[in-house]
Amino acid sequence: DVTAQVLTVKSFPLSIDFKGRIEVQGEAIMRLSVLDEYNKTADEPLKNARNAVAGAIRNLDPKVTEKRRVEILFYNVNYIENGDIKTQEECVEFLKNSGFKVHPFFKVCKGISSVMSAIKEIEFNRKTLDILTDGAVVKVNDFSLRNSLGATDKFPRWALAFKFEAEEVTTSLGSLLSQFKL
């Protein structure tokens, strides 16, 4: 149970105007600038933002989560009592209007060329973003069409992930020590 840890996340609204049961879905992140700032004073610097977030949420001490300044970007409403959300666009608007933080790159596209242009825009801008991103997810906007398309055992047929080429870095090997046992 990570409830205590999540309650320390400033981007997680502790109350919303909607009166009823709701289940939302999001992704916990650490901004790269926050990681850099944290590492300047940390006894043990964190290797990367993804591991930092996972460790902060799984940690038994909520103060660790709070100190790492984790954020949550929400992207889906899995269930809404007496709600009538018909599209992903309406879903994101509901989340924003309810005080949930959403990813700034959400975009509704019309046609394949518009989709491909949006993917290229994200890939082009990814180095300037303050968050890690390794790709883009394209989803069918209309929920009734999503239901018609269904899913396989593992994945929805109405969503497609585009992964960007991995970023590579070069490092120098300072020394090499070989040991053999005979």
Residue ranges and their predicted role:
Residues 1-182:
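RNA/tRNA-interacting regions in translation and RNA-turnover enzymes
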